[in-house]
Structure formats: structure tokens, C-alpha cells
Amino acid sequence: MNTLDWTQLTADARTQALTRPVQTVATQTREAVATLIADVRARGDVALREITARFDGVTLDSFAVSEAEFAAADAAIAPELRQAMQDAVARIDTFHRAGMSEGYAVETAPGVVCEKIVRPIGRVGLYVPAGSAPLPSTALMLGVPARLAGCREVVLCTPPRKDGSVDPAVLVAAQLTGVRRVFKLGGAQAIAAMAYGTDSIPSCDKLFGPGNSFVTEAKQQVAQSGAAAIDMPAGPSEVLVIADAGAQPAFVAADLLSQAEHGPDSQVLLLSDSDALIAAVQEQLDLQLAQLSRADIARQALAQSRLIKVATLQEAFEISNRYAPEHLILALREPRAWLAQVEAAGSVFLGDYTPEALGDYCSGTNHVLPTSGAARAYSGVSVASFQNMVSVQAASKAGIDGIGACALILARAEGLDAHANAVALRMGVAA
């Protein structure tokens, strides 16, 4: 990893230091996704079978996972994996349930009551990728809040393996969250199918889940068309660690590597006011990297990552807020005392014994988070992501008589005569 001294960098160099790996969507990628979506819309399941054969190397008679396949998955996974997923579900449920909104009502004027009521989104589509490895944890992170929200129907798509099966852990994870409509479908074609619907795949109101550049582009295109809403902008995974001189170098290095192994376009940053800590972390990175099965992937990510020396921890937080990381680890002696300095981050991990991996799997928070700086304005997935907040108002005759004049003045100022008339008629006055 490159080591930089923030105090010695020019403004342009500082901007470059915080620049994420280039992930421009090439024109050919955008056009390929648009063509694929159009094909799925026009030919439905026929197109899906051809595309799946081309990209996944398997021809499927049926996309739907059968009850027999669910049963086989149940029998295939190790008992300790099942128990770990059950434990994770319980904690994810506990955390997300605590944050649920029940709506509210308030009288804003005599005879005028305004309410906010909460309704589940009708049908949602979950995408669980399986590029370099299947991700049953993503099925848990999406399935639990969808269940708590009360969505009428939850659809899940995940890529098939070359033998036509689906990773059994993903199927068990789906079952544990109450998801039974699972389809063997991956990539941009899965997004197109869930957005527009085919004979086999129902169209969904909102789509959730991470994916590669084709999946990300497909989500953007279907959202722009109005076919389906999406959870948030997506991008490569990332972590920023702020560490003081008392941090454990081995812990910090392990956290950086746990994010770097996601993919070659991941980015990891360390900000510290200690030269000794930075040097020790670099040594640990070299030692630990050699032991990883995905060392080649992690090494590519580290090549575009940074170890940055800062003058003060306060400066580190200013840099972090500018970067707005997906994951922020505070490897500090008094991490909670610094929490108020955090303005933009997807998820924060406090202290030496809270690795980012806990949030990925089983602490209870959600690991589907905004990336690429989107944490400045977006939040991670929650139960509210699967719900609509509907406004309700009711006015009595006395209520409209009391506040109607306000509406009349504003309607006239905007030149909207019909608006004014709708109020005036009820008040029995001239518009």
C-alpha cells in the first residue's frame, strides 16, 4: 500500500488520495445491458434461458427452485452453519425490529388532524450474487427486514451453478427469513426479469441487493425507466480505519484485508497520527496477505489503497467525512467519545474488538450499505426501505374554516385558481 503524509500533499494530491478506483461504465457495457433488458422485455423466459445458457453455462427447464431442492439444501448444509445463520437471523431481527416506525398522528390546528401511516411495499425483489463466492449472508440481510416490513410477496434471484443447482446455504438462508419464491437467475437478466416480469418471474415494485457492474447498470436503467425502484446506488466495497498509537497493528491489518479480499476494485484506507502504527500495519499486511486464499484479489485492491499519516485525529475525521466510507472503523482508545465527529458513513465499528466482519455477518446491523460516497445522503437497508410512509389528513368544517384562508392566499399567489376554488367552496366564500 502507498503511504502518504496528508500534511505534505497539495489540494490536488489530497483529492487524488481519496479518489476511488475508476469504475466508469463503458459505453459497450451500458449498451449491452440495455440490449439485454430489451430482449427480456420482448421475449421473456425464452430470452432468459438463452442468456443463462450463455453466461452461466446451463440450460434450465425451470427457473423456480422446487420444494425438493429446498429439502435437499436443508440436508446438505453443516449443522454449525445452520446454527450460525439462525443466530445471525435472531440478532438481525432484534436490531431491525427496534428501529421500526409505527407512524403517528398530530392535530396541527383545531379540527385538522395529520397522520403518517406505514404500509409495506407490495412485492419486492432481492438479488443475492454468487460471482466469486455465494453470499448467503446477503439473503439474511435482505430477507429479515422484508419480513418485518410485512411485504406481501418477496422474490429472490440468485445465479445457478453449472449443474443447474443453487448454493444450498443461500436456499437455507432464504428459508430462515421466510422467502420461498427463489429463482435460478443471475446478472442483469435477473434485474430485468424482476423489474418487468416474465411468465415465470413476477414483476416487483422495488429491487434490492449488490452485484457486479452489469447488475449495477441494470438496476440504474430499470430505475430510470420507472419500472421498479431500487435500494441505493451501488459500487465496490470499501473501508476506512481511523487508528491511534494504541491500536493493535494485527487487528487493523486484518480489517483492511477483510475488505480488500472482496474484489480488485475494493478500496481500503488507514488514517493515523502515528508513524509507528502505520509501519507496523504495513508489516502485518505483508505477513497476513501471504496466508489468504484470495491473496491475488486482495493484492490488487491494496495497490489502489492508502496508508495516510495525519497531524491529528480531528483531521482524520475531517478526511473521513469528506470520503464518506461504506464502513468506518474507529480503532481508538475512546472510540465513543469520537462518535459525534462522524457525519457521513454507512456503518461504524467502535474499538479494537469490533471488526467490520461482525457487521457483515452477525452483529445485527445491515451490511447492505451505500458506497462510493453515497453515505453523505443515503442510509443502509432497514425495515423502512421495504415500506411506504403515507400521509393522511382530515379536516372538519371548523378545521377548514380555521386554516382555509391560509390556503386561499397561497393558491392565489401561485395563480392556481382551481386550488383556491376547491377551498373557497367548502368555506362558503368567494375564491
UniProtKB/Swiss-Prot annotation:
Substrate binds at S237, Q259, H262, H327, D360, E414, H419. Zn(2+) binds at Q259, H262, D360, H419. GO terms for biological process: L-histidine biosynthetic process. Its EC number is 1.1.1.23. Pathway: Amino-acid biosynthesis; L-histidine biosynthesis; L-histidine from 5-phospho-alpha-D-ribose 1-diphosphate: step 9/9. It is an enzyme of class 1 (oxidoreductase). Its cofactor is Zn(2+). InterPro entries: Ald_DH/histidinol_DH, Histidinol_DH_CS, Histidinol_DH_monofunct, Hstdl_DH. GO terms for molecular function: histidinol dehydrogenase activity; NAD binding; zinc ion binding. Transmembrane segments: none annotated. It catalyses: L-histidinol + 2 NAD(+) + H2O = L-histidine + 2 NADH + 3 H(+). This is Histidinol dehydrogenase. It comes from Xanthomonas campestris pv. campestris (strain 8004).
